[in-house]
Amino acid sequence: MTTFDFPSVLVPLVGLVFPAMAMASLSLHVQKNKTV
């Protein structure tokens, strides 16, 4: 567990998870608008 290795793992994780969550919530919002 090195201090330099932690950000290098965290950055791609956040860079992938955050957009994925954003797109998922966006698609859910679009689906809700289409059904109503």
Curated annotation (Swiss-Prot):
It comes from the Eukaryota. It is found in: Plastid, Chloroplast thylakoid membrane. GO terms for cellular component: chloroplast thylakoid membrane; photosystem I. Keywords: Chloroplast, Membrane, Photosynthesis, Photosystem I, Plastid, Thylakoid, Transmembrane, Transmembrane helix. It is a single-pass membrane protein. Pfam families: PSI_8. The chain crosses the membrane at residues 6-28. GO terms for biological process: photosynthesis. Belongs to the PsaI family. May help in the organization of the PsaL subunit. This is Photosystem I reaction center subunit VIII.
